[in-house]
């Protein structure tokens, strides 16, 4: 969302950290990305973007659930009909015919979705990493897929974001912000 989602708190955080730098293994961090919520676990950059960034490793977050009630849009869901999924896949050139089934076919070690398989009347297609999130226009790779069958509708439940440095982790138990080292 970039600067469109900025507010008094984010502006204050930027001002308070002006002139500070992040280092990982003695080198300046080239890409620092942050999230406000990870849904319970972050994810390795390799499992999302396909490139290994040493300081972007997946970890279970034992604290996220404790603050979930105050995180806007922590849990949300959407529903796709088989017809809508068929259109999405055909628009991407996957050509599997009419979608008959959609399911999570692989999870990462932290419980995020690694791949989703769509089965249609003319074949199957497995979509992996970031592509499965963007295909379904989801906020993260921490989602579940349910439904299908006779109702011919698939519900998708999503929580948090996946790959980044936690903005919440930058605040200690007293509420004082602290620098992130990346190690």
Model-identified regions with their sequence ranges:
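Conserved, single-site charged/polar hotspot
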Residues: 1-183
């Amino acid at each position: 969302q970039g600067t469109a989602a900025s507010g008094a708190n984010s502006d204050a955080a930027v001002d308070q950290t002006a002139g500070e730098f992040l280092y990982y293994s003695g080198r300046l961090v080239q890409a620092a990305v942050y999230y406000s919520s990870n849904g319970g676990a972050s994810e390795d950059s390799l499992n999302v973007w396909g490139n290994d960034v040493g300081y972007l490793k997946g970890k279970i977050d034992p604290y996220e659930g404790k603050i979930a009630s105050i995180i806007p849009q922590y849990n949300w869901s959407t529903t796709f009909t088989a017809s809508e999924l068929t259109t999405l896949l055909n628009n991407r050139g996957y050509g599997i015919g009419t979608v008959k089934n959609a399911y999570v076919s692989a999870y990462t070690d932290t419980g995020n979705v690694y791949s989703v398989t769509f089965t249609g009347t003319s074949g199957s297609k497995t979509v992996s990493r970031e592509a499965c999130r963007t295909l379904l226009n989801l906020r993260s790779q921490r989602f579940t897929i349910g439904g299908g069958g006779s109702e011919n509708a698939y519900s998708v439940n999503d929580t948090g974001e996946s790959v980044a440095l936690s903005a919440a982790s930058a605040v200690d138990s007293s509420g004082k912000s602290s620098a992130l080292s990346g190690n």
